Design a protein with these regions (language model features):
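Binuclear metal-dependent hydrolase catalytic cores centered on His/Asp/Glu-rich metal-binding motifs
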Residues: 48-59, 91-92, 150-203, 220, ...
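Active-site-proximal segments of metal-dependent phosphoesterases and phosphodiesterases across multiple
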Residues: 82-100, 198-230
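A short C-terminal boundary segment appended to hydrolase-like catalytic domains
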Residues: 29-32, 42-49, 195, 268-358
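Conserved beta-sheet core of the metallophosphoesterase superfamily
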Residues: 104-107, 216-278
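Bacterial N-terminal signal peptides
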Residues: 13-23
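Active-site environment of divalent metal-dependent phosphoester hydrolases
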Residues: 44-46, 79-82, 111-127, 143-149, ...
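Short acidic, glycine-rich surface-loop motifs adjacent to enzyme active sites
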Residues: 68-80, 188-213
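N-terminal catalytic scaffold of extracellular/periplasmic and nuclease hydrolases
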Residues: 29-120, 126, 137, 200
């Protein structure tokens, strides 16, 4: 009874807060970085079927992606190789669509369970395709030469990306490899000891496919990565949009996103034209280390991604307030921390649906 009354009060407070937020958008403070994180990107597979993918982004959506300080995405595909034979679960890229992912603020994560679909030959060709399209990447490397990727070279303190996976060693080597979890952990420790003020973003390809909840392995290693000094930890592999949280007991109040889901995912025809495709927007206060996040909602139509027209400042605060309200009454946040399904227009229906499901 008490919990039902508390929940009713939280919903009323949330609706009232939403109306106040709608009346006055909140501007981002100076010194705050925005990191856009996309899940699995597979520029091949079903995208090559008629009608083939054309433009991946409309001009307004592309402009929004360019406005972020950093745009990260998981490159879940191999390059062409002599063993290339496309099927339902093995994918190889010809590289034709890659120039459309060449954002000046962007970087691809190349440690996952598909980068070695073409063995070392395919991995080498993927690296060549990325470099030819002027896309920075971290993950694949010549054995013994791994280095964190500096995302904002002119900025102090520096921001680095480190990428690894417990599942990307199959088919690797002998020369081209990715980091395993123990190697990734040591890389975080080494970087933190060398640059104590740096911001460390860690991407790991891990999780249980088809499940939005974090796996035991994810939680175990997230705690270890956080203790080693990671500021932000991003997971993808499950193909689901998971929750996100701050590990309050960690030394740097590490932010963790448990599942980035799919983005431009040519591995499944269902993502050709889909009404709910998301990006995670993370804001990092470089002065205080504070972090917040919200989902940005969009859709695909014949593989072209476009964002819905929503007031992002409202969306951000509603999702943050919802997560805190759920914590007050001892319940986990609504799955995915947001809408069940994005809708067109200004997204108010989805915001009210969020409160209804709280």
């Amino acid at each position: 009874m008490v919990q039902r009354m508390t929940m009713a009060w939280v919903k009323w407070l949330g609706c009232a807060g939403l109306l106040l937020l709608l009346s006055g958008p909140v501007m981002a403070a100076e010194g705050v970085l925005e990191i856009l994180a996309a899940g699995d990107v597979l520029l091949g597979g079903r995208m090559l079927e008629a009608p083939q993918a054309g433009e991946l982004f409309g001009p307004l959506t592309r402009r929004r992606l360019e406005q972020a300080d950093i745009f990260l995405w998981n490159c879940e595909i191999a390059g062409l190789s002599s063993v290339s034979k496309q099927n339902t679960f093995v994918f190889h890229a010809d590289g034709l669509l890659f120039p459309q992912m060449a954002f000046a603020n962007g970087a691809a994560c190349t440690a996952n369970n598909h980068v070695f679909d073409g063995l070392e030959e395919g991995a080498a060709n993927l690296m060549a395709v990325l470099e030819g399209a002027r896309i920075r990447h971290n993950g694949l490397h010549d054995r013994g030469t791994f280095a964190p990727l500096s995302l904002l070279p002119q900025r102090e303190p520096p921001v680095y990306l480190l990428t690894g996976s417990p599942m990307s060693q199959i088919g690797s080597g002998p020369r081209i490899v990715t980091l395993s979890y123990p190697q990734l952990l040591e890389a975080v420790r080494t970087l933190r000891a060398r640059e104590p003020e740096a911001c460390i973003i860690l991407y790991s390809h891990d999780g249980n496919e088809g499940f939005s909840e974090a796996s035991d392995r994810q939680r175990l290693w997230a705690d270890w990565f956080a203790a080693a000094g990671a500021d932000i930890i991003l997971f993808a592999h499950s193909h689901c949009y998971g929750g996100f949280e701050t590990l309050e007991a960690s030394p740097r109040k590490t932010f963790v996103a448990w599942g980035l889901g799919n983005f431009l995912f040519g591995g499944n025809r269902g993502w050709r034209s889909r009404s709910d495709v998301r990006l995670l927007s993370i804001r990092l206060d470089m002065a205080t280390g504070g972090k917040s996040a919200c989902w940005l909602y969009g859709k695909t139509k014949n593989w072209q991604f476009s964002l819905y027209r929503m007031d992002e400042s409202v969306l951000r605060q509603v999702q943050d307030l919802g997560a805190r309200a759920a914590a007050i009454v001892g319940q986990p946040p609504v799955e995915g921390n947001g809408q069940e399904k994005a809708d067109e227009g200004f997204g108010l229906g989805s915001l009210f649906l969020f409160w209804k499901n709280l």
